[in-house]
Amino acid sequence: MDIIVDSDSNMPVDMNRKLLQIGDVYALQEKETAKWFAFQIVNLGEENAVYVDLDYWSEQEPTQGDLKSMDYLRLNHHLWNNTIHYCWAPYELFPIRAKLIGNIDIRPLDECKCHGNWPDGSQQKWTESWNELPEEQVRAFKVALAQKDHTIIIAGKEVKKCLYGVFDDTLSLLSDFSELDKLPGLGRIVTNKEHPQMIPFLERRHLIRELIWNDCKLKDVDLSCTHLEELEISGIDIEIIRLPARTKIITLKGKLSPKLKIISPNDGYFMILRVEMQDDFLPDVGLSRLTTLVLKHIQNFSLKTLTSRFPDLFWLGLTGKPGYIRDVDEITKLHDLETLTMDDLFGFSADEFPQPESLPELKRLWLESIPSDAAKAIKKRYKSNVHDMHVLKPRSDEWLHENLNNPLRYWDGSEFISKSKYSKSLALWKEARRRLLEAVALSDG
């Protein structure tokens, strides 16, 4: 059976609800690996259905003959403990390429209290990756989590054996990093210093997934033999960062060298690059197959070269300080773009913003604190073209002029801050600022 349910062709919610039946098993291909995974429909509501992840994970598309061997996927990776994952998901976002394999009996499950989106194969992928880790390290990790009150001595300090993160106050006291082997639950290292033993230690500890390295002085940061999933790093001296295939998130902070290159086995495919920019500078880091890019602290930035550097983006997130964004029409070149978010950015019109037909894969459009004229036109233009759209806090030129240096501007229009509280707080800030400026003027005089 090879039925494709296409909800991205503006299929009504009622039609999706009628197509789905309890017991139906659907299959999809996970994007990064192209492997097939499966899930089953186990409950139907008014606007949402409950699915449960199944344990099918293969390079071969499943057939009806595979149904009898499928079981609920039990999660044991990271903090999960033999847990079945099932979740409510909206009919209107049912995945476009889901293929109906057949229908089998469901098994008893407790009431579903999880709400989210349809599966993407990440749980099956995580399970496979977790099962490839050294068994003794995984076993020690799970034991440490189960003994949350068990304490040990590290660098002369008493800490919990399940401790997740260590900082320089501990690292600087170590004469031998092997002392950290007493911490099987260790998953994050945060440092502002150079520790010669750190990288070799990371290379043999497979469950340490995060490194935050501030003000790194190395020119060549070789992490290629580590097992890091996330890296946050800063340092003007860095010219090369070498990553393992396992790294999926890298965050760059502070001033960056114009020579900076990032080397990854997958060249950025299925990787998230976050950059907290200074002076709107974004070096050409490589990663030509990058799929997710998030730029923060934009002040005055052009997208002119961005799309040629990263032509395969699925997700583009842009956040101002607030700031101005130029050459917005360049986004039309990102034909695979599925998600676009913009926040606190100005300097563009509705005419410059891409037309829906130029972004055929776009499913999510989140715009907040953008020019009011553009916001109104874009919202109307995309209303029937994307499933997930939020256009919030449209701003006029007058508002921008008055609030450019207002630290409370994020409260204006917030659903969490009432208008009266914002007005009172703004008045207090203005009065405090006036007094401060008067005091500075008197001291200078």
For the regions a protein language model found, what residue spans apply to each?
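Core of folded catalytic or high-affinity ligand/protein-binding domains
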Residues: 44, 441-445
